[in-house]
Design a protein with these regions (language model features):
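Terminal hydrophobic/aromatic helix or amphipathic segment near a protein terminus
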Residues: 216-261, 297
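Conserved Rossmann-fold cofactor-binding substructure of NAD(P)-dependent oxidoreductases
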Residues: 45-65
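Amphipathic terminal alpha-helices
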Residues: 266-298
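Short, conserved active-site loop motifs that form the nucleotide-linked donor/cofactor pocket
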Residues: 43-44, 137
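Aromatic "clamp/platform" in nucleotide-sugar-dependent glycosyltransferases that forms part
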Residues: 83-88
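Oxidoreductase cofactor-interface core, primarily capturing Rossmann-like NAD(P)-dependent enzymes
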Residues: 2-27, 31-38, 52-54, 62, ...
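Short glycine-centered helix-capping/turn motifs at secondary-structure transition points
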Residues: 160, 261-265
Length: 298
């Protein structure tokens, strides 16, 4: 059985759906019981489990053969790094008590770095933990999610501009669509794996916040501009979004790491480089259509 941790997220839902479309036996691990019915209707088995609760996780993974792991951002926790380490301990222990033969997991650009990455440190910890398992694993270090601009699109549609943490606005970053991440993960889960592999995944090009504004200007048929958020306002901005102080601090450090060039792909021998097919324009157009936004937004 193919089990997907994080099936309700952008990437996890794509992974589970693609596996189901192949006629494979899929289990979606969820925290929210209200989302169970939609997966059951698609033909998936559903298990309710909390990554901070070993017993529920071990029960859910008992009959799993192949596992996809994507951990939650933990923005609501007072100690995101410490609590995430507990999640990783539970995952590793549950895997060792199961019949799991291989794992595909989602890491991030910068996942090889121990310092200066803020929230990405959680994924460094994940890489280190899962590499200790005596079964094959493959990690996907994904670039900046194009979906991170979801709220920016809404703001641009209504106000004609959006705020960006990317500073300067013309800074080019490796970006990738969740669609391409999920597709790669589903393919890897169906392969025979050996050892501990690492893949660095980006889109067909690098993009900036100014590129986002240009794409949205074309799609909305009006001028869209970008306003850069000063770094000294990062933490307060994230706290306004509802993050805990600790989570806001981590996100601020992460953004500064991107902006100063510290967070990057490792790009060394032995690490596979793969490029997704979805362009920024295609991703933005899809998001607008999905949200039923008016292309001629005022």
């Amino acid at each position: 059985m193919y089990t997907v941790i994080g099936a309700s997220g952008h990437v996890g839902s794509i992974v589970a759906t693609e596996l189901l479309n192949k006629g494979l036996s899929v289990q979606a691990i969820l925290r929210n019981p209200t989302k169970a019915a939609q997966w059951q209707e698609k033909g998936a088995k559903v298990a309710l489990a909390d990554l901070l609760n070993y017993d529920s996780l071990a029960t859910a993974l008992k009959d799993t053969d192949t596992l996809f792991v994507m951990t939650p951002p933990a923005f609501h926790l007072e100690d995101p790094i410490g609590e995430h380490l507990k999640m990783l301990d539970n995952i590793a222990a549950a895997v060792q008590q199961s019949s799991i033969r291989k794992i595909v997991y989602l890491s991030s650009i910068g996942g090889h770095l121990r310092n200066g990455t803020g929230a990405i440190l959680k994924l460094y910890d994940m890489e280190q933990k899962l590499r200790l398992l005596d079964i094959p694993t493959v990690g996907i270090r994904a670039g900046w999610f194009m979906e991170n601009f979801g709220e920016s699109i809404k703001q641009a549609a209504s106000e004609g501009f959006f705020y960006s943490f990317i500073n300067p606005a013309d800074l080019k970053l490796p970006m990738v669509a969740a669609k391409d991440i999920g597709h790669l993960a589903s393919l890897l889960m169906q392969q025979e794996l050996q050892g501990h592999r690492m893949i660095e995944l980006s889109g067909p090009d690098v993009y900036s916040a100014e590129d986002v504004a240009s794409v949205l200007s074309t799609l909305f048929e009006k001028q869209i501009s970008v306003k850069v958020i000063p770094s000294e306002q990062y933490q307060s901005t994230y706290r306004q979004f509802g993050l805990t102080d600790a989570a806001a601090k981590l996100m601020a450090e992460m953004n500064e790491g991107f902006n100063n060039g510290h967070i990057r792909f490792e790009n060394k021998e032995g690490i596979e480089q793969i490029y997704g097919e979805t362009t920024l324009a295609e991703n933005m157009s899809f998001t607008i259509e999905k949200e039923h936004m008016n292309f001629r937004a005022k």
